[in-house]
């Protein structure tokens, strides 16, 4: 899926705003403090805010997205989340002076699909009931090992596209995916 001029412009404007914060001198100071902490030479306790209820945070439309392409929509969302956090509660976060682009990595998951029914949905809140697919010991055989694959040609294409979009605004860095391995979080949806 090609990006429109409007989408490219939205990405560029978001990247410019991100880089304004990422280029501030305070970033180097925060990096110094984090490195000291990681070397067991803490200068002061460090604070980071995590586990944000993003579905509740877009009251002022700061997180509205304009890009349809799934890869670059993710880039747009990640940039906007970082900007949002930095504007509202920066504490000791560090903004890297580059734009992260996801490599083309896929994951087969555990070989099962969640079967659910939505009981209640209102705005950003919903309640679900999950079909028990693991009722017996035999059912456990349905769980498969994950298979992780990397499409190098697609990763190269993403890098080229991103480099062109963000040229003169920010360097581009390819990043791997972080796969959530909290097995119980997944298993609870199969039971």
Outline where the language-model segments fall.
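Catalytic cores of TIM-barrel enzymes
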Residues: 1-191
């Amino acid at each position: 899926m090609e990006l429109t001029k409007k989408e490219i412009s939205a990405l560029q404007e978001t990247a410019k705003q991100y880089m304004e914060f990422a280029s501030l001198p305070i970033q180097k100071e925060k990096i110094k403090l984090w490195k000291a902490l990681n070397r067991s030479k803490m200068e002061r306790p460090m604070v980071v805010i995590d586990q944000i209820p993003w579905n509740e945070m877009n009251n002022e439309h700061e997180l509205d997205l304009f890009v349809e392409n799934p890869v670059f929509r993710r880039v747009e969302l990640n940039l906007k989340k970082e900007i949002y956090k930095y504007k509202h509660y920066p504490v000791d976060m560090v903004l890297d002076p580059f734009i992260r682009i996801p490599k083309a990595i896929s994951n087969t998951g555990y070989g099962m699909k969640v079967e659910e029914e939505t009981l209640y949905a209102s705005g950003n809140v919903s309640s679900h009931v999950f079909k028990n697919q693991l009722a017996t010991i035999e059912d456990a055989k349905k769980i498969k090992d994950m298979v992780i694959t990397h499409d190098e040609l697609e990763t190269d294409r993403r890098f080229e596209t991103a480099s062109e979009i963000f040229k003169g605004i920010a360097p581009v860095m390819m990043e791997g995916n972080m796969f959530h391995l909290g097995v119980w979080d997944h298993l609870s949806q199969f039971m």
